[in-house]
Amino acid sequence: MKGTKKKTPCNKKLGGYLKEQKGRLYIIRRCVVMLICWHD
Protein backbone atom coordinates (compact mmCIF):
# COMPACT_ATOMS: atom_id res chain seq x y z
CA MET A 1 0.00 0.00 0.00
CA LYS A 2 3.00 2.29 0.45
CA GLY A 3 3.85 2.24 -3.27
CA THR A 4 0.38 3.34 -4.36
CA LYS A 5 0.93 6.87 -3.07
CA LYS A 6 3.74 7.56 -5.53
CA LYS A 7 1.83 6.20 -8.52
CA THR A 8 -1.29 8.34 -8.09
CA PRO A 9 -1.04 11.67 -9.95
CA CYS A 10 -4.57 12.54 -8.79
CA ASN A 11 -3.15 13.02 -5.31
CA LYS A 12 -2.53 16.69 -6.09
CA LYS A 13 -6.06 17.06 -7.42
CA LEU A 14 -7.46 15.48 -4.29
CA GLY A 15 -5.36 17.78 -2.12
CA GLY A 16 -6.69 20.84 -3.93
CA TYR A 17 -10.24 19.56 -3.63
CA LEU A 18 -9.80 18.97 0.09
CA LYS A 19 -8.35 22.45 0.49
CA GLU A 20 -11.36 23.92 -1.31
CA GLN A 21 -13.75 21.97 0.89
CA LYS A 22 -11.89 23.11 3.99
CA GLY A 23 -12.22 26.75 2.92
CA ARG A 24 -15.90 26.34 2.19
CA LEU A 25 -16.46 24.64 5.54
CA TYR A 26 -14.63 27.48 7.27
CA ILE A 27 -16.82 30.09 5.58
CA ILE A 28 -20.01 28.19 6.42
CA ARG A 29 -18.89 27.81 10.03
CA ARG A 30 -18.19 31.53 10.30
CA CYS A 31 -21.62 32.34 8.88
CA VAL A 32 -23.27 30.00 11.38
CA VAL A 33 -21.36 31.56 14.28
CA MET A 34 -22.31 35.05 13.10
CA LEU A 35 -25.96 34.03 12.82
CA ILE A 36 -25.95 32.54 16.31
CA CYS A 37 -24.29 35.65 17.76
CA TRP A 38 -26.70 37.86 15.85
CA HIS A 39 -29.70 36.00 17.27
CA ASP A 40 -28.43 36.61 20.80
From Swiss-Prot:
Coiled-coil parts of chain: none
Compartments in which it is found: Cell membrane
Family the entry assigns: Belongs to the DVL/RTFL small polypeptides family.
Organism, as annotated: Arabidopsis thaliana
Source species taxonomy: Eukaryota, Viridiplantae, Streptophyta, Embryophyta, Tracheophyta
Membrane topology value: Single-pass membrane protein
Descriptive protein name: Small polypeptide DEVIL 3
Pfam family, one: DVL
Residues passing through the membrane, by range: 12-28
Gene Ontology terms: biological process: negative regulation of cell population proliferation; shoot system development
Main subcellular location of this protein, as a coarse class: membrane
Cellular compartments per GO CC: plasma membrane
Required for DVL/RTFL small polypeptide activity: region residues: 9-40
Disulfide bonds: none
InterPro entries (UniProt xref): DVL, DVL/RTFL_small_peptides
Function according to Swiss-Prot or TrEMBL: Small polypeptide acting as a regulatory molecule which coordinates cellular responses required for differentiation, growth and development, including leaves shape, pedicule elongation, inflorescence organization and fruit maturation, probably by restricting polar cell proliferation in lateral organs and coordinating socket cell recruitment and differentiation at trichome sites.
Keyword annotations of the record: Cell membrane, Developmental protein, Membrane, Transmembrane, Transmembrane helix
Tissue: Mostly expressed in flowers and stems, and, to a lower extent, in roots and leaves.
Gene, per the UniProt record: DVL3
